[in-house]
């Protein structure tokens, strides 16, 4: 898929702007705080209906404006289609081909993106919450079923936590309702866990050879899914559900005393091992960076396999930080296949082959100067 045009109205520091996009590489150059990252963020937000930089949509609206609008025309192998996102201080509205979508699960997946920013090192060295969000953002783009299962799980988790808190405070005494909630909780916990396990397995298969290539076969990467609910995946669905219910039943008193759910996908994690050692704890910054890049490049290939279209790659101020070896592997992945948007303060240090296939835009105070 390609983004042909991007139109912004009242988005961050942009008043009105239209970007006609190059099908290969688009380089956004400018000093800091001019709007480069805002433009990249708008593409991400158009794809996922949420920003990667803030959870408050109101921050996306230009100062003193009543709304923000993002619109993009996409081309696929079989035609073109517009996507629109309209943000007000009361909420947001999304449209596919001019038709409003009542649920975000119906919207997400029409535009797939992979973002690589300096903070993506936190996928390796940050908290489990960051890694769970990474799984949800990437898997959610390629599986509407996963998005729905995750939304149902989060709804039931909230209900269960509210009831556990009432039990802890003595406001409720009946455990029957907790047993009912646990039954629903177990069903969706199993679905989310199953899909995450499969996703990590597929991602590892693609990331391993990429990582080996970047390191000239000196390092071996492995991904390990660490689910909070541990059960035998080889069992049939009924047996797995029974095993989860047994875990929840055995820990019902503990959860009641703590007033919170102690087990479930909301406590999952992933570990990244390099040559058998945990990269988070023992990896150098170079190893952590290579691991993060390998994961991102694997995402690109996995999305193409799953949906039949390459995603759009967003590189936020990272390209010039990659050494020649990493840039070479990045180039071999994206060249003439993946439409890419790059932000940078200088083109120095960017591979000349990337520059030869690129269109340069200068960004100055929320305006695009070609």
From Swiss-Prot:
Protein location: Cytoplasm
Gene Ontology CC entries for this record: cytoplasm
Domain of life assignment: Bacteria
GO biological process terms, semicolon-separated: DNA replication; DNA synthesis involved in DNA repair; double-strand break repair; SOS response
InterPro entries: DNA-binding_RecF (IPR001238), DNA-binding_RecF_CS (IPR018078), P-loop_NTPase (IPR027417), RecF/RecN/SMC_N (IPR003395), RecF_2 (IPR042174)
Gene3D superfamilies: P-loop containing nucleotide triphosphate hydrolases, RecF/RecN/SMC, N-terminal domain
Major subcellular location class: cytoplasm
Binding site for ATP: 30-37
Pfam families: SMC_N
Keywords in alphabetical order: ATP-binding, Cytoplasm, DNA damage, DNA repair, DNA replication, DNA-binding, Nucleotide-binding, SOS response
MF GO annotations: ATP binding; single-stranded DNA binding
PROSITE patterns in the record: RECF_1, RECF_2
NCBIfam families given in the database record: recf
Function, in words: The RecF protein is involved in DNA metabolism; it is required for DNA replication and normal SOS inducibility. RecF binds preferentially to single-stranded, linear DNA. It also seems to bind ATP.
Protein name: DNA replication and repair protein RecF
């Amino acid at each position: 898929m390609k983004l042909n045009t991007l139109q912004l109205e009242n988005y961050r520091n942009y008043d009105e702007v239209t970007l006609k996009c190059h099908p290969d590489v688009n380089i956004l150059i400018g000093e800091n705080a001019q709007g480069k990252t805002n433009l990249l963020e708008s593409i991400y937000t158009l794809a996922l209906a949420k920003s990667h930089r803030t959870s408050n949509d109101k921050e996306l609206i230009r100062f003193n404006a009543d709304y923000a609008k993002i619109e993009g025309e996409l081309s696929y192998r079989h035609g073109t289609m517009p996507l629109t996102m309209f943000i007000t201080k009361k909420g947001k509205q999304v449209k596919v081909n001019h038709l409003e979508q009542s649920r975000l699960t119906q919207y997400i997946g029409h535009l797939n993106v992979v973002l690589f920013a300096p903070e993506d090192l936190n996928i390796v060295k940050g908290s489990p919450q960051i890694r769970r969000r990474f799984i949800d953002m990437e898997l959610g783009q390629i599986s509407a079923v996963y998005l729905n299962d995750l939304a149902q799980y989060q709804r039931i988790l909230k209900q269960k936590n509210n009831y556990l808190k009432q039990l802890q405070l003595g406001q409720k005494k009946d455990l029957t309702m907790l047993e009912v909630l646990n039954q629903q909780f177990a069903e969706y916990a199993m679905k989310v866990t199953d899909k995450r396990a499969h996703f990590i397995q597929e991602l590892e298969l693609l990331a391993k050879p990429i990582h080996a290539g970047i390191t000239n076969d000196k390092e071996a990467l492995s991904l390990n899914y660490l689910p909070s609910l541990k059960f035998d995946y080889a069992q049939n669905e009924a047996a797995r559900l029974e095993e989860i219910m047994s875990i929840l039943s055995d820990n019902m008193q503990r959860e009641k005393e703590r007033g919170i759910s102690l087990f479930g996908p909301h406590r999952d994690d992933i570990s990244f091992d390099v040559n058998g050692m945990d990269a988070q704890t023992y990896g150098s910054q170079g190893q952590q960076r290579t691991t993060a890049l390998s994961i991102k490049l694997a995402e690109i290939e996995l999305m193409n396999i799953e949906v039949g279209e390459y995603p759009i790659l967003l590189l936020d101020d990272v390209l010039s930080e990659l050494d020649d070896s990493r840039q070479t592997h990045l180039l071999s992945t994206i060249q003439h296949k993946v439409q890419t948007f790059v932000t940078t303060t200088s083109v120095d240090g960017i591979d000349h082959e990337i520059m030869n296939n690129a269109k340069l835009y200068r960004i100055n105070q929320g305006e695009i100067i070609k």
